[in-house]
Amino acid sequence: MKKTISLAAVLLAATTPAFAHPGHGAESFAAGVAHPLTGLDHIAVMVAVGLWAALKGQRALWVWPATFVGVMLIGGALGMAHVPVPFVEPGILASVVALGLLVALAVDPPVFVGVLVIGVFAIFHGHAHGAEVAENVGGFEYMTGFAIATASLHAIGIGFALTMQRASLRPAIRAAGAVCVLIGAGLYAGVL
């Protein structure tokens, strides 16, 4: 009896799921990872969140990126469910400029104010990710992919900012914020 149960457990553990339709598993995960990496607006904002969190330091270093990812997932679920959220595209564009300015000007608000600002913008980005998902893509895998890609972009911003701070090159962080503002202006003008 023990051998039968052990064999059944091994066979169960060794099996892989069979999907009757394409777009599940690895394909969905890859689509989720790719989505934030294919838009300059998304890249700029997600790196800017990391930059701003590193400028603030302490709790903001993890609270602000975690807020963005968490609220973005809520927005993604709303988008996938086709729940309308007003002003998504203008909100995304405003987020590029606003977060770039917050970094460029080294604005230092209380952590909860940053959470509110970041949360509002994350809803827009998440909704865009969710609304643009293909019908044949698995939602959980897709959302996992875009959450990991987003967290990675935050980590890039944090890593850059912390490296610049250690090298006494804090103005480089603020310059990166100014680049975000320019990206936002370029997107608004239609040249990017």
Please state what every model-predicted region is:
Residues 2-192:
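Membrane metalloprotein/metal-transporter helix-bundle signature
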